[in-house]
């Protein structure tokens, strides 16, 4: 079922501009060695204070959590909602979560917290019906049938044309009506009118890579256009053994897809509009990186 955002999550988008300093060099930072170091982020002071004070209570379920409640999808008591950025997205996002995925380890919750109006999370086997809208939807998942983001518009337009042909093949429909419908609805793939994308929703699977097959092979997802992010590398601290570094965490996949969509499909310069999707992720990444460095230093002292 759809998990709609709580009323109090509908906060002002002014939180973004209040803290964010736009950096003109953002496009070059994406390709840097540490892709998280030059993000245009809202102030993370609220997370720093929460980290120092420790776990806090969820105001909905009463559970003890750090930063946010991963079952209620809300910040905890010591993280004021008004200090959490709100991200506006160009597309709707559906996340299909594996039932055995550990909620506390999932990064999908970050998207729901930061873009509640645009993100829905479903727990498998609950999956929306996409069959009638396969020309408006794409699934981000690697595989031999996957295409790159820049080719999405072309392939979705082909689906529209195939659907039109299928409708006009009705033998009971008078031939002159079929011809007229084709003239009205059919367009050349090279025609400038057809180069815009019809994409309205993107689907992500939230699961360990070893568990994704159960969801991916579900008949309700079969036949959807598949998109793969082939050039991005993960920073995830829970990297799964034996998997390539191009296998991203859920929030990384969402973020990088939107960045590439912005430049390759919308044809606009990227200026950090979606960076706050990594608001929690980048903070946790830095915490773990610092802890690891401190641990390595302590180990070094013991071995000398």
Curated annotation (Swiss-Prot):
What GO molecular functions are on record for this protein? tRNA-uridine aminocarboxypropyltransferase activity
- Residues forming the motif DXTW are 206-209
Subcellular location per UniProt equals: Nucleus
**What family does the database annotate?**
Belongs to the TDD superfamily. DTWD1 family.
Recorded source organism is Pongo abelii (Sumatran orangutan)
Q: What is the lineage of its organism?
A: Eukaryota, Metazoa, Chordata, Craniata, Vertebrata
What is the role of this chain?
Answer: Catalyzes the formation of 3-(3-amino-3-carboxypropyl)uridine (acp3U) at position 20 in the D-loop of several cytoplasmic tRNAs (acp3U(20)).
Q: What is its EC number?
A: 2.5.1.25
Q: Which reaction does it catalyse?
A: a uridine in tRNA + S-adenosyl-L-methionine = a 3-[(3S)-3-amino-3-carboxypropyl]uridine in tRNA + S-methyl-5'-thioadenosine + H(+)
- Which keywords appear in this protein's UniProt record, sorted alphabetically? Acetylation, Nucleus, S-adenosyl-L-methionine, Transferase, tRNA processing
From the UniProt record, give one GO term of the biological process aspect: tRNA modification
Listed GO cellular component terms? Answer: nucleus
* Chain positions found as N-acetylserine: 2
Descriptive protein name: tRNA-uridine aminocarboxypropyltransferase 1
Task: Tell me the enzyme class.
Answer: transferase
Pfam (any one) = DTW
